């Protein structure tokens, strides 16, 4: 997050009315003429007068964007939109046209000529904080405190936010749930076109997935408040986390006659995949490249449950494939009492355990509807391999775009570091390795390495995942000081090819 200190001045100084309107005009220039016209028409249609000025009240905002009541986020987003205006009265929320325009510019990515991406993220997260309006009244009027903030580095600004702000954990959970439910929403569509996502039995699965994502944002499971810095850091590792909000709020830039028209869906039902599902696809689209976003560009190349649990079968399918690929591993955690009926589990003898397993929160922190086995059974791990696979008896493959990730029971992303290039290993006599190393003399695989690493045995039956500091892969954001490892029994393993030649549909990314 290296930013020049002067970039923050525009956010925190008290602007005059003329400066505020001039900046708003700069935002509006990033909208095309038709978008500006539609925005004004839509605003006029639902506006009411307050002290001679046209505004949107909360009911108008809620009616227009149609966020389902089950999500309970309309007041949250209305307050966020109001915070982009100049009215500092904590007891009076009023959404003016200029505030709505600035809100839309930030959420839909039309802020590039005025704010950096980091500044936009900062403004959005600040607008989610319960203490934000009070902060603007009491702190921004203190010129000395403003000056200190303006001339601070990013770390000081993050610390300042954490000391003065707080975001309700329940709001961020609902936000995660909304994003998973509208992951296929396209610009110009209303949420009503996807209302079934909030009604069918899948909604329970989406609630559980939202909890996984929430745990990845904040390690403070027992706290009802999330630190703003946690969200800032999470957006760095999941840069497309809020992209669906851009599509949701772009509705204001389309003519009213088009709001209930569903855009032709180009997404297949994923029937040909063993592990990949619409929900898992929604999660990986938070952080993987845009070429992954369209399902019609993805192909299931290898499924262990179909092609066989064999490194030879995996080699036949993968070593002639030249595009990037996604590895997904669906597994059950191995605990002390676990016994395998198919093959003795000798992993502990081969690779002695160094760290305890990771327990996500406490029983009280996990909703009862998610089940008693939430902590210690299912695990879903994966890797994005940016280069072609190859036999690596002597070395490794992959590049700096390679990454590891976990989706269940916690959503985390582990990016490649600059410490070494031991990203991926494919050795039929050893198995699959990520972030491991080899002895310089004997060439034997070394499992006792620092950093984040993953190993799958040569029978594709069991493996381990370790999170312990920096190595070939970085530790998860907000979990840098956590050290743990998981042993697991593989239920299925799938490799998915990514067609990078298919054109990616353009979309405005808000964050």
Swiss-Prot record:
SMART domains membership = TLDc
| GO process terms (BP) | response to oxidative stress
Taking every annotated instance into account, which residue ranges of this chain make up the domain TLDc?
Answer: 274-499
* Location in the cell: Cytoplasm; Nucleus
The record's listing under InterPro entries reads: TLDc_dom
One of the record's GO cellular component terms: cytosol
Primary location group: cytoplasm
Query: Is the keyword Cytoplasm in the record?
Result: yes
Look up the domain of life of the source. Answer: Eukaryota
Alphabetically sorted, this entry's keywords are: Cytoplasm, Nucleus
The record ties this protein, via Pfam families, to: TLD
Q: Which family does it belong to?
A: Belongs to the RTC5 family.
Name the job this protein performs: May be involved in a process influencing telomere capping.
- Protein name per UniProt: Restriction of telomere capping protein 5
User: Species name for this entry?
Assistant: Schizosaccharomyces pombe (strain 972 / ATCC 24843)
* Gene that this polypeptide is encoded by: rtc5
